[in-house]
Amino acid sequence: MIITFVLAFIIAMSSYGKIKMGSESKPTIGTFRWVAMIMCTLLAGGGVFWSAAEPIFHFITPSPSFSDVKGGTLAAVAPALSQSFLHWGFLAWAVLGTLSTIVLMYAHYNCGVKLRPRALLYPILGDKLENHWIGSVIDACSIIAVAAGTIGPIGFLATQLSYSLTVLTGLESSLMSQIIILTVIVSIYSVSAFSGMDKGLQWLSRMNVIGAVALLVAILVLGPTGFIFKEFGMAFGTYIQHLPEMSLSTADPSWNSWWTWFFWGWFIGFAPMMAIFIARISQGRSIRELIITVAIIAPIATNFWFSSLGGTGIFLELQTPGSISQPLQEAGLPAVLLASLAQLPFSFLLIPAFLVLTTTFVATTGDSMAYSIAMAVEGTDTPSRYQRLFWAVMMGVVAGVLLIAGDGGLNALQSFIVITAVPVSFLVGVTFITGPIAVLRMKSAELESKSSVDCTKSVTV
């Protein structure tokens, strides 16, 4: 993941960053909508669920990288946030949509290859995999991995909403209540997937960003504004300073398997299909625009979001020890968001607003990934609405099965995500080679003033 980020950043800052991707000279989707669709698809419900829960967990129990820091103290704030930044920062975003997207856009728009995961190997294998069974296996593994990565947020949201309803209404949180909530969520994003990218998905993404910004402003106004900005700056500095050692740490395998390896397995599993989705909406964008947006702007925005929600919870815990840690200990991660918001002014408005935002975030991810899977299966940019609907519903069904298998807990969901990402990691790793090759060939085509390039010839530097 470090290599992906470094390579992508070097390409973006070089003269190759000016290369326009796709068959259109100008972007086909406005910048605001483009950024909104990218961010909302990855953040999903995790952007709300984990942004509140993860920092407070690392604050109470510092990660192995900061084992010398005493938990629950002011000194533990920056390390806690910086550990969260690692999981949701530059490296995670880079692996999702930089080199892999460049390769797919080259293969599809320059060489006419179908937009499928197997196309990530096109720069080195040509069309050998187009009709080969190995190509089908690659596509199948990628579909399973992204389905798992999408099912995770759907399941997380079901547990979050079920717990919230228990606290707000007194109704018992049970597996049945989670399944009912899951059914409602799946219905929402299935309708959006059926409506298509130009209607349901773009509308959902736009509303998500507007809602997220509004709620972020509310947190900054009603919460500990100075504390949030101060600790964000300190945590970001700590993150940059300790990035190499945190990302390469293997000090505690059991801890890593629950945190770092889980998150990175999640994002790697997402990568091929996320790249397909970004490639579909990025025609007319330059390589530099893509990389700066995906690997720089999006991670920083995500980190500030984590600082705002997670930092608020940490501040409240510092002011009143036990106010956040006690609900966390008693009810687990889903309790943190509610415990934090309940202590702010106008909590009766903030709590339902955040729950609605979490739901629409997950709906955006379910919608976009159903669209990407349908594209990979049909091999077309505009898959049929029934194909999109089928995959939207199937992801919900599997999420329900995993919730039942895990008795409503998170362990089954997390294990499913990590296991399915293993074979995909090899495919994503190849982009270290195919990414630069694709860039060189697109540059060659640009210099020759061609709309397409001889995709079989070698490129000399």
Would you name each region that the model predicts?
Residues 1-3, 138-146, 152, 194-222, ...:
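Membrane-interface loop-to-helix entry segments
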Residues 3-10, 44-47, 87-159, 167-193, ...:
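Helix-loop-helix module between adjacent transmembrane segments
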Residues 1-76, 194, 217, 431-447, ...:
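N-terminal alpha-helical transmembrane segments of multi-pass membrane transport
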